[in-house]
Every structure is written in structure tokens, then in C-alpha cells.
Amino acid sequence: MLNIFNLVCICIHSVLYSSSFFSAKLPEAYAFLNPIVDIMPVIPLLFFLLAFVWQAAVSFR
């Protein structure tokens, strides 16, 4: 469990302090997709939270 936590911390650290992460832009033809692209990194976290809600619904069998 500690290794997973360390991996998550490393990933968050690399995202927050990566200069190329904030300077990347979509081409003009796809500029209308910017709001969707901004939300996309959160989607895996929603699935992770859904797993806990599902387990709570079935009483953590």
C-alpha cells in the first residue's frame, strides 16, 4: 500500500512541477475541446471512487 501511495505522490509531483504540462496546447482546430480535455485527468479518479461506493453498497463482501 505504501508503494502505491509513493507512486501517486510521484505522479502528482511530476504533474504539478512539469513546465511542459502547462504549456501544451491543442491545435486551433480542436480548441473547442479544451473544456473536455481539462476534465479528462479526473475521470480515472471518479472510477476509483465508484469502486468504493459500489463496495459500500454491497457491504464490503
Swiss-Prot record:
GO biological process, one term: photosynthesis
Membrane topology field: Single-pass membrane protein
Segments passing through the bilayer: 36-56
Protein localization: Plastid, Chloroplast thylakoid membrane
Protein keywords: Chloroplast, Membrane, Photosynthesis, Photosystem II, Plastid, Reaction center, Thylakoid, Transmembrane, Transmembrane helix
Alphabetized SUPFAM superfamilies for the sequence: Photosystem II reaction center protein K, PsbK
Propeptide: 1-24
Function of the molecule: One of the components of the core complex of photosystem II (PSII). PSII is a light-driven water:plastoquinone oxidoreductase that uses light energy to abstract electrons from H(2)O, generating O(2) and a proton gradient subsequently used for ATP formation. It consists of a core antenna complex that captures photons, and an electron transfer chain that converts photonic excitation into a charge separation.
SUBUNIT field: PSII is composed of 1 copy each of membrane proteins PsbA, PsbB, PsbC, PsbD, PsbE, PsbF, PsbH, PsbI, PsbJ, PsbK, PsbL, PsbM, PsbT, PsbX, PsbY, PsbZ, Psb30/Ycf12, at least 3 peripheral proteins of the oxygen-evolving complex and a large number of cofactors. It forms dimeric complexes.
Similarity annotation: Belongs to the PsbK family.
HAMAP family for this protein: PSII_PsbK (MF_00441)
Stored PANTHER family: PHOTOSYSTEM II REACTION CENTER PROTEIN K, PTHR35325
Name of the protein described by the UniProt record: Photosystem II reaction center protein K
Organism: Glycine max (Soybean)
